[in-house]
Structures are given as structure tokens and as C-alpha cells.
């Protein structure tokens, strides 16, 4: 990106700005650069942020807006930065060590399928994604019971896509598929388990 005309004029009276306009990476040679200098440097070259020992939040935003994947190189990025990154590139959440819950929601907001990028998704995230797309239950390694129930209540035959459904999930699914209530006795639950097991083998 090119320098602004106003920056060029200002650089006539500011040697540090003049240095950065010539070579943004040279900000590393400036002790405690101002926020404006940091932002100018990263706007011209996003990699300049690696030369700043304590980059300001505004400079970080400039970088994330240009390249969301740069969040990988930021220590403890703020919630706002995490959300900004995953809103632009959902799979960038894989580069965040401990993504916040709001960033996870932002990741699946437009496409619930993006849950595949989230390691060990929280219960709330699982349920939110499954509400939008019940068939996604098959992509969850260990879906929580709430997510299982959400799936079968919306689409009963998703029971056959759940590796180890809970007894309660199987009961609800069979009731939905059969169209009538089933008394949850031990005998009935054993029968339901057998039915589901047999269906898996089909």
C-alpha cells in the first residue's frame, strides 16, 4: 500500500516517519514508536508488526484486516481481534490457542459447517451449529447429549449418524420415528438399543 500524501508532507518534518515511509520494517529500530507510526508501518507492510515489541491494538487491527491469519503470531489476542479474524476467515480460529466463546460463535455464525475448525467445541457451540444443520452431528467426535437431542428432535434419522448415542437420545429418536410415546422401562430401553444397533449394521 502506498503512503498518503499527508504522510509524505508530514515526513518532511518527522525523521522517524520518513524512515518508515522508505522502509516500514525499519520501525524495529525505533524505540517505543507512537501508535500513529505503528499503524503507518503495518498499513504499508503487515509484516512490520513483527518488528514492534509491544504493538498497539489499533496496529493489530490493521494487520488482521489485511491478513486474518496473522493472528497466529499475536500473543493473547483480545476478544475483538479474535472475532475480527474469524469473521473474515473462519478457519483462522485454528491458529488461536484458546479462542474465546464469542469468537467460536462468530466462526459458525454464517456457516455452521465451520464447527469443524473448532477443537473440542463447547456445548453451546455444538447445540447452536446442530440447530442450524442437524446432519452436522456426524462431524462431531464426541457430541454432548444436548447436541444429540437437538439433532434427533429436528431430524430423527440423524440418530444413525451418532457414533454412541445416549439412551435418552435413542428413546427420543425412536419415539419420533415411530410416532408414539414409549415408556422408558429397562425392557423397552434394551429393545430400543437393539433396534438402533441393528440399524447401524444395515
Predicted regions located by residue number:
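Alpha-helical scaffold segments
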Residues: 2-202
Amino acid at each position: 500500500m502506498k503512503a498518503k500524501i499527508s504522510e509524505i508532507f508530514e515526513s518532511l518534518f518527522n525523521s522517524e516517519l520518513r524512515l518508515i515511509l522508505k522502509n516500514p520494517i525499519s520501525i524495529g529500530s525505533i524505540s517505543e514508536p507512537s501508535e500513529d507510526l505503528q499503524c503507518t508501518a503495518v498499513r504499508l507492510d503487515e509484516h512490520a508488526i513483527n518488528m514492534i515489541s509491544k504493538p498497539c491494538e489499533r496496529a493489530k487491527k490493521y494487520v488482521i484486516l489485511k491478513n486474518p491469519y496473522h493472528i497466529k503470531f499475536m500473543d493473547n489476542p483480545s476478544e475483538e481481534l479474535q472475532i475480527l479474524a474469524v469473521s473474515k476467515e473462519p478457519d483462522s480460529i485454528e491458529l488461536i490457542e484458546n479462542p474465546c466463546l464469542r469468537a467460536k460463535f462468530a466462526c459458525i455464525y454464517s456457516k455452521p459447517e465451520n464447527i469443524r475448525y473448532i477443537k473440542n467445541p463447547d456445548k453451546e457451540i455444538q447445540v447452536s451449529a446442530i440447530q442450524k444443520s442437524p446432519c452436522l452431528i456426524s462431524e462431531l467426535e464426541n457430541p454432548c447429549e444436548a447436541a444429540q437431542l437437538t439433532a434427533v428432535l429436528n431430524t430423527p434419522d440423524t440418530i444413525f449418524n451418532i457414533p454412541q448415542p445416549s439412551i435418552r437420545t435413542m428413546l427420543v429418536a425412536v419415539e419420533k420415528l415411530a410416532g408414539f410415546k414409549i415408556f422408558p422401562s429397562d425392557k423397552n430401553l434394551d429393545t430400543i438399543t437393539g433396534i438402533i444397533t441393528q440399524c447401524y449394521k444395515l
